Amino acid sequence: SSKPSLNYRLAVLLTSNEEGEPEDGKIDVIIKKFMDQGEHIDFCLVGEPSSNKKVGDTIRIGRRGSLSGTLKVLGKQGHVAYPEKVENPIFTSAKLISELESITWDEGNEHFQPTSFQISNIKSGTGATNVVPGVLEMMFNFRFCSESNEAHLKETFEAVLKKQNLEYEIDWVLSGLPYLTEKKYFIEQIVNSVKSVTGYEPIINNGGGTSDGRFLQVMGSEIVELGPLNETIHKTDENVSLKDLDTLKGIYTNLLERLNSN
């Protein structure tokens, strides 16, 4: 028997440079080319490893944004035996970190957990035991929900720096804004496909890091993330079982057939 024809156009977008800094090969470059050509993506299924314990047990319909910064707290270098002649940036940073850690940035909402602030790296000192350093460098990150925005987070953070009368330098990098798919149609089709293939209904959880789904929001696309287990992501020997891939293939196939019949 002949295979049914598709009543929609199907495209597969592959990134060759997900983790790298250069622009070539990133999904946002592809999306820009699509938009320049007048193309529009109605529905986008992102194969991000969303599943927790079983394939398809969790889907994501949004993600928090990511705002990173590198802060240099400036002091005055000198000998540890002459405290009156030094300004120790480690001491001043300790007070700063304590205050930043105590801030409730927002309360989150029904779709997202509250905005979180984390410090990922701290570097200071010469390696000598008798020298007070002249600078402390701290790298940090906000994972922010739709209750906060870039300007609010920067303003609040730098207000603490000024309140403590610190001399500092700071660089900010916004790597992604929050996004949320609020239309129900595509979500319902994916939920039904998971139930049809696996027998269980997925939960919706918008936690985790950023994903390439954020690049599609400029098109107004309906975006849902559904992929393999995330147990080993970014670990040594990262892997996906062939059985899980087969289940995922079944869900994807069911979804394509379901969309074609509707």
Language-model region placement:
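Acidic/histidine-rich catalytic neighborhood of metal-dependent amide-processing enzymes
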Residues: 1-62, 260
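Metal-dependent amide/peptide-bond hydrolase catalytic core
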Residues: 49-54, 61, 67-262
